Protein backbone atom coordinates (compact mmCIF):
# COMPACT_ATOMS: atom_id res chain seq x y z
CA UNK A 1 0.00 0.00 0.00
CA UNK A 2 1.24 3.51 -0.81
CA UNK A 3 0.71 6.25 1.75
CA UNK A 4 1.44 9.98 1.71
CA UNK A 5 2.68 11.17 5.09
CA UNK A 6 1.71 14.84 4.87
CA UNK A 7 2.51 17.51 7.45
CA UNK A 8 -0.30 20.03 7.15
CA UNK A 9 0.69 23.68 7.06
CA UNK A 10 -1.35 26.77 6.31
CA UNK A 11 0.24 27.24 2.88
CA UNK A 12 -0.11 23.56 1.87
CA UNK A 13 -3.81 23.01 2.60
CA UNK A 14 -4.82 23.07 -1.08
CA UNK A 15 -2.14 20.51 -1.97
CA UNK A 16 -3.23 18.34 0.96
CA UNK A 17 -6.79 18.40 -0.37
CA UNK A 18 -5.62 17.12 -3.76
CA UNK A 19 -3.51 14.43 -2.11
CA UNK A 20 -6.40 13.27 0.07
CA UNK A 21 -8.75 13.05 -2.92
CA UNK A 22 -6.37 10.76 -4.85
CA UNK A 23 -4.25 8.85 -2.32
CA UNK A 24 -4.31 7.32 1.14
CA UNK A 25 -2.99 10.25 3.19
CA UNK A 26 -2.03 10.35 6.86
CA UNK A 27 -0.79 13.12 9.12
CA UNK A 28 1.16 11.05 11.67
CA UNK A 29 3.85 8.43 11.13
CA UNK A 30 2.06 6.11 13.54
CA UNK A 31 -0.88 6.04 11.09
CA UNK A 32 1.22 4.44 8.33
CA UNK A 33 0.02 0.82 8.06
CA UNK A 34 2.76 -1.84 8.27
CA UNK A 35 4.04 -2.76 4.82
CA UNK A 36 3.45 0.73 3.40
CA UNK A 37 5.52 2.55 0.82
CA UNK A 38 5.57 6.05 2.32
CA UNK A 39 5.89 9.30 0.40
CA UNK A 40 6.99 11.98 2.85
CA UNK A 41 5.50 15.38 2.00
CA UNK A 42 6.63 18.24 4.28
CA UNK A 43 7.03 15.57 6.95
CA UNK A 44 10.55 14.15 6.82
CA UNK A 45 12.71 17.08 7.86
CA UNK A 46 14.50 17.66 10.12
CA UNK A 47 14.34 14.04 11.36
CA UNK A 48 14.66 12.14 8.07
CA UNK A 49 17.01 9.46 9.39
CA UNK A 50 14.84 8.76 12.43
CA UNK A 51 11.68 8.56 10.30
CA UNK A 52 13.40 6.18 7.88
CA UNK A 53 14.48 3.90 10.75
CA UNK A 54 11.14 4.08 12.57
CA UNK A 55 9.15 3.17 9.47
CA UNK A 56 11.53 0.27 8.76
CA UNK A 57 11.03 -1.03 12.31
CA UNK A 58 7.26 -0.91 11.69
CA UNK A 59 7.65 -2.86 8.42
CA UNK A 60 7.24 0.11 6.06
CA UNK A 61 9.70 2.16 4.06
CA UNK A 62 10.11 5.64 2.64
CA UNK A 63 10.08 6.00 -1.14
CA UNK A 64 13.59 7.49 -0.77
CA UNK A 65 15.88 6.17 1.95
CA UNK A 66 17.86 8.55 4.11
CA UNK A 67 20.97 7.72 2.08
CA UNK A 68 19.20 8.50 -1.20
CA UNK A 69 17.95 11.76 0.27
CA UNK A 70 21.47 12.74 1.36
CA UNK A 71 22.82 11.96 -2.13
CA UNK A 72 20.49 14.61 -3.57
CA UNK A 73 20.38 17.05 -0.65
CA UNK A 74 24.16 17.21 -0.31
CA UNK A 75 24.67 17.78 -4.04
CA UNK A 76 26.64 14.53 -4.25
CA UNK A 77 24.82 13.63 -7.47
CA UNK A 78 26.66 16.42 -9.28
CA UNK A 79 29.60 14.25 -10.29
CA UNK A 80 27.24 11.72 -11.88
CA UNK A 81 25.57 14.36 -14.08
CA UNK A 82 28.40 16.88 -14.44
CA UNK A 83 28.68 16.48 -18.20
CA UNK A 84 24.97 17.31 -18.60
CA UNK A 85 24.54 20.28 -16.27
CA UNK A 86 26.04 23.65 -15.44
CA UNK A 87 29.62 23.51 -14.19
CA UNK A 88 29.82 23.73 -10.40
CA UNK A 89 32.50 24.05 -7.73
CA UNK A 90 32.66 23.70 -3.97
CA UNK A 91 35.92 25.67 -3.84
CA UNK A 92 36.47 28.62 -6.16
CA UNK A 93 40.24 28.23 -5.97
CA UNK A 94 39.74 25.12 -8.14
CA UNK A 95 38.72 27.12 -11.23
CA UNK A 96 40.11 29.87 -13.40
CA UNK A 97 36.57 30.85 -14.37
CA UNK A 98 35.88 34.31 -12.94
CA UNK A 99 32.12 34.61 -13.26
CA UNK A 100 29.29 35.16 -13.27
CA UNK A 101 28.13 32.61 -10.67
CA UNK A 102 25.06 31.33 -8.90
CA UNK A 103 25.83 30.88 -5.20
CA UNK A 104 23.74 28.57 -3.05
CA UNK A 105 23.92 26.00 -0.29
CA UNK A 106 24.08 22.29 -1.07
CA UNK A 107 20.31 22.00 -0.64
CA UNK A 108 18.81 25.47 -0.42
CA UNK A 109 19.19 28.87 -2.01
CA UNK A 110 17.95 32.40 -1.49
CA UNK A 111 16.49 32.72 -4.98
CA UNK A 112 14.02 35.33 -3.74
CA UNK A 113 17.05 37.51 -2.91
CA UNK A 114 18.54 36.95 -6.36
CA UNK A 115 20.49 40.18 -6.78
CA UNK A 116 21.96 40.23 -3.26
CA UNK A 117 22.21 36.62 -2.08
CA UNK A 118 22.43 34.39 -5.15
CA UNK A 119 23.79 36.03 -8.32
CA UNK A 120 27.46 37.06 -8.32
CA UNK A 121 29.08 38.89 -11.23
CA UNK A 122 32.57 37.67 -10.31
CA UNK A 123 34.61 35.54 -7.88
CA UNK A 124 35.03 38.33 -5.36
CA UNK A 125 31.28 38.81 -5.05
CA UNK A 126 30.66 35.03 -5.03
CA UNK A 127 32.98 34.66 -2.02
CA UNK A 128 31.16 37.53 -0.26
CA UNK A 129 27.76 35.92 -0.85
CA UNK A 130 29.04 32.53 0.39
CA UNK A 131 30.37 34.23 3.53
CA UNK A 132 27.00 35.91 4.12
CA UNK A 133 25.15 32.62 3.62
CA UNK A 134 27.21 31.12 6.46
CA UNK A 135 25.16 33.38 8.77
CA UNK A 136 21.84 32.27 7.24
CA UNK A 137 19.69 30.12 9.55
CA UNK A 138 18.61 27.80 6.73
CA UNK A 139 21.79 27.61 4.66
CA UNK A 140 24.55 28.30 7.19
CA UNK A 141 25.42 24.65 7.88
CA UNK A 142 25.43 23.68 4.20
CA UNK A 143 28.56 23.57 2.06
CA UNK A 144 28.47 26.45 -0.44
CA UNK A 145 28.02 25.57 -4.10
CA UNK A 146 29.23 27.90 -6.86
CA UNK A 147 27.55 27.23 -10.20
CA UNK A 148 28.50 28.76 -13.52
CA UNK A 149 25.72 31.17 -14.43
CA UNK A 150 24.28 30.27 -17.80
CA UNK A 151 21.58 32.70 -18.90
CA UNK A 152 18.46 30.97 -20.16
CA UNK A 153 15.70 32.49 -22.24
CA UNK A 154 14.16 34.98 -19.83
CA UNK A 155 10.38 35.24 -19.87
CA UNK A 156 10.21 38.09 -17.36
CA UNK A 157 12.09 39.63 -14.45
CA UNK A 158 10.49 39.21 -11.05
CA UNK A 159 10.89 40.88 -7.69
CA UNK A 160 14.53 41.42 -6.63
CA UNK A 161 15.70 40.86 -10.20
CA UNK A 162 14.88 37.14 -10.27
CA UNK A 163 14.75 36.00 -13.91
CA UNK A 164 11.89 33.67 -14.78
CA UNK A 165 13.29 31.44 -17.49
CA UNK A 166 12.16 28.74 -19.86
CA UNK A 167 13.76 25.94 -17.85
CA UNK A 168 12.95 22.25 -18.25
CA UNK A 169 13.62 19.34 -15.93
CA UNK A 170 13.55 15.84 -17.33
CA UNK A 171 13.49 12.70 -15.19
CA UNK A 172 14.87 9.34 -16.28
CA UNK A 173 14.73 5.84 -14.90
CA UNK A 174 17.74 4.16 -16.46
CA UNK A 175 17.60 5.26 -20.09
CA UNK A 176 13.83 5.83 -20.20
CA UNK A 177 12.42 9.34 -19.74
CA UNK A 178 9.58 9.02 -17.26
CA UNK A 179 8.57 12.65 -16.71
CA UNK A 180 9.23 16.24 -17.69
What are these regions (language model features)?
Residues 12-13, 46-52:
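Short, well-ordered alpha-helical microsegments
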Residues 1-28:
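Short, charged N-terminal beta->alpha structural module
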Residues 4-6, 32, 42, 50-166, ...:
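Active-site nucleotide/adenylate-binding loops and adjacent lid/helix of ATP-dependent enzymes
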Residues 169:
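Short, surface-exposed charged micro-motifs
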Residues 36-37:
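Structural motif
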Amino acid sequence: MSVILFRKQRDTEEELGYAESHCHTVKYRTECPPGSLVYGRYSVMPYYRELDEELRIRGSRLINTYGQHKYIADFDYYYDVAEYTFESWFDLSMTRYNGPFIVKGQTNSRKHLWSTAMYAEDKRRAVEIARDLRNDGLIGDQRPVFRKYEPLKTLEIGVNGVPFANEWRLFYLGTKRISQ
